[in-house]
Curated annotation (Swiss-Prot):
It comes from Aromatoleum aromaticum (strain DSM 19018 / LMG 30748 / EbN1) (Azoarcus sp. (strain EbN1)). Acts as a chaperone. InterPro entries: ATPase_NBD, Chaperone_DnaK, Heat_shock_70_CS, HSP70_C_sf, HSP70_peptide-bd_sf, Hsp_70_fam. Keywords: ATP-binding, Chaperone, Nucleotide-binding, Phosphoprotein, Stress response. This is Chaperone protein DnaK. Residues 601-645 are annotated as: Disordered. Pfam families: HSP70. PANTHER family: HEAT SHOCK PROTEIN 70KDA. GO terms for molecular function: ATP binding; ATP-dependent protein folding chaperone; unfolded protein binding. Induction: By stress conditions e.g. heat shock. The modification Phosphothreonine is found at residue 199.
Length: 645
């Protein structure tokens, strides 16, 4: 049985970890970094770049470089958050046939789970390279406040990447696992404040020691799935653009290339301001107009940056207040505060958290890696490698159905521990009604229209009866991944209809299968490209080596042999100009065969040289025949030196 890896699929960066010898280990990627940018680029030649290579070429390929796609996953095109992103992103966000928000790259529409799958494939490959075996199973984390569609879409992304998602767990819960695993026994209540690249979560978690077993129980969770580091970057970009327009009279918002350079610079400046009091954004030749090139140089102080994002930091406090209230706790009941997510490194954020909770946040948790570590621990629990750990997570939002008058009737309240099941009996609204439509909703608003629609299905063939008479039992069943299954049953006839909630948007099974096949085909292309590079390198090295040897030892072989080698070398060099792996391999073999005689001469020469050295060391105690051979060797060396002159 292979390892179950833990993946933190982040908005800005992703991370992968695995249990090894009972301890979680964060795995470095092929570039040697412990986190990988969640960036995917589609090159002109059809190649797909992921991670740091994709991020590096973003400036020159802005329209086809996708980042922060997690903010679109499982969302409808009409949602106001998506509409807000359309104006900010250099790439195109379009409406899919099912009304979901998709992206368009090089004239092709792509679903966000497909883009996330590329990042997951990179994480999978990172783990496989480290473990030396195939990986097919994973625990993937999502923001605690992700709704059902977003969780389902994340699971789909895993499938497209060739991973069986054994469990979807909430990011703050994963961070709590990472924090609480090696803590001394005893009960404690912790607040996990998770401010990442695109989402914010707060979870109140109780870690209890029950008969030697670590129990992690989520008491309440809250958050905002459209608030994170990307928004902080955007405030900085807007400020710089405004300043530049004041000075130079040029609006950089209309220049995609300039904006991409500015985005990188803003991110860097934001990070620098976490340790320094001032930084300068310096971008020469940012743009040009009739008067010539323009250079951008803007000084930003930490105080200025803090004033730009003050309301964003403040927005994280209300969910903290609500989560505490839902958990039935006071601020004094919290023993530890843990900060997770890169944006939580900002001093102003830490100051606000300290101000609200009345205590310093813990510094012994790595904000970038804790979530992946927790996911790996959960993988270990599922595999039986980690014992004595029980994780009790919750559903972040209430679930219910639409009833008469457009009201949402809740069957499962928010912060209910999952897995869970709830049933309620409903009836018909009209006389002789033969079918009912079950409209499934998620959210906290009283009216159905204010909540997220997860999907709907019909229960038909209800026997004619006066309104209010038929007994229709609706059952909601949430699995451990927080994904909902709904059934409706007519108690009189026993007729039942069930669905696993597939958002009335979402990807259909056929689409997922097609994307899985696309990804597999792409993996095969990658493998072939890799093999071509390997054989090309081998052939190149052989040509170089034979060329060098021919220069040194060419006079030791016949002119005929030399000509054969030179021809084989020319053929190999010609093959290297093309992309046919088999041709390169065949020409390389031909060159290896042709240069065999040359190799023999080199070997004989080196053996002879060694023999001479041995005789000399023996002080002349060798036979005359040996001496004759030695003389030959010295002669040959002498001739070679003379030739070079």
């Amino acid at each position: 049985m292979g390892k179950i890896i833990g993946i933190d699929l982040g908005t800005t960066n992703s991370c992968v970890a695995v249990m090894e010898g009972g301890k979680p280990k964060v795995i470095e990627n092929s570039e040697g970094a412990r986190t990988t940018p969640s960036v995917v680029a589609y090159a002109e030649d059809g190649e797909i770049l992921t991670g740091a290579p994709a991020k590096r070429q973003a400036v020159t390929n802005a329209k086809n470089t996708l980042f922060a796609v997690k903010r679109l996953i499982g969302r409808r095109f009409e949602e106001k958050e998506v509409q807000k992103d359309i104006d900010l992103m250099p790439y195109t966000i379009c409406k899919a046939d099912n009304s979901d928000a998709w992206v368009e790259v090089r004239g092709k529409k792509i679903a966000p789970p497909q883009v996330s799958a590329e990042v997951l494939r990179k994480m999978k490959k990172t783990a496989e390279d480290y473990l030396g075996e195939e990986v097919t199973e994973a625990v993937i984390t999502v923001p605690a406040y992700f709704n059902d569609s977003q969780r389902q879409a994340t699971k789909d992304a895993g499938r497209i990447a060739g991973l069986e998602v054994k469990r979807i767990i909430n990011e703050p819960t994963a961070a709590a696992l990472a924090f609480g695993m090696d803590k001394k026994p005893g009960d404690s209540k912790i607040a996990v404040y998770d401010l990442g690249g695109g989402t914010f979560d707060i979870s109140i978690i109780e870690i209890a020691d029950i008969d030697g077993e670590h129990q992690f129980e989520v008491l309440a969770t809250n958050g905002d799935t459209f608030l994170g580091g990307e928004d902080f970057d955007q405030r900085l970009i807007d400020y710089i653009v405004t300043e530049f327009k004041k000075e130079q009279g040029v609006d950089l918002k209309k220049d995609v290339l300039a904006l991409q350079r500015l985005k990188e610079a803003a991110e860097k400046a934001k990070i620098e301001l976490s340790s320094g009091q001032q930084t300068e954004v310096n971008l020469p030749y940012i743009t040009a107009d009739a008067s010539g090139p323009k250079h951008l140089a803007v000084k930003i102080t930490r105080a200025k940056f803090e004033s730009l994002v003050e309301d964003l930091v403040q927005r994280t406090i209300e969910p903290c207040r609500v989560a505490l209230k839902d958990a039935g706790l006071k601020i004094n009941d919290i023993d530890d505060v843990i900060l997770v997510g890169g944006q939580s490194r900002m001093p102003k954020v830490q100051e606000k958290v300290k101000e609200f909770f009345g205590k310093e946040a813990r510094r012994d948790v790595n904000p970038d890696e804790a979530v992946a570590v927790g996911a790996a621990i959960q993988g270990g629990v599922l595999q039986g490698e980690v014992k004595d750990v029980l994780l009790l997570d919750v559903t972040p939002l209430s679930l219910g159905i639409e009833t008469l008058g457009g009201v949402m009737t809740k069957l499962i309240q928010k912060n209910t521990t999952v897995p869970t099941k709830a049933s309620q009996v409903f009836s018909t609204a009209d006389d002789n009604q033969s079918a009912v439509t079950i409209h499934v909703l998620q959210g906290e608003r009283e009216m159905a229209s204010g909540n997220k629609s997860l999907g709907q299905f019909n229960l038909s063939d209800i026997p004619p009866a006066p309104r209010g008479m038929p007994q229709i039992e609706v059952t909601f069943d949430i699995d451990a991944n927080g994904i909902l299954h709904v059934s409706a049953k007519d108690k009189a006839t026993g007729k039942e209809n069930k669905i696993k909630i597939q958002a009335n948007s979402g990807l259909s099974e056929d689409e997922i299968q097609r994307m899985v096949q696309d990804a597999a085909a792409h993996a095969e292309e990658d493998k072939k490209a890799h093999e071509l590079v390997d054989i090309r390198n081998q052939c190149d090295a052989l040509v170089h080596s034979v060329k060098k040897s021919l220069t040194e030892y060419g006079d030791k072989i016949s002119a005929d042999e030399k000509e054969k080698i030179e021809q084989a070398m020319k053929d190999a060099e010609e093959a290297l100009k093309g992309n046919d792996k088999d041709t390169i391999e065949a020409r390389m073999q031909a060159l290896a065969t042709a240069s065999q005689k040359l190799g023999e001469q080199m070997y004989a020469q080196s053996q002879g040289a060694e023999g001479g050295a041995t005789d000399e060391a023996a002080g002349g105690g060798s036979t005359g025949g040996s001496k004759a051979a030695d003389a030959d060797v010295v002669d040959a060396e002498f001739t070679e030196v003379k030739d070079k002159k």
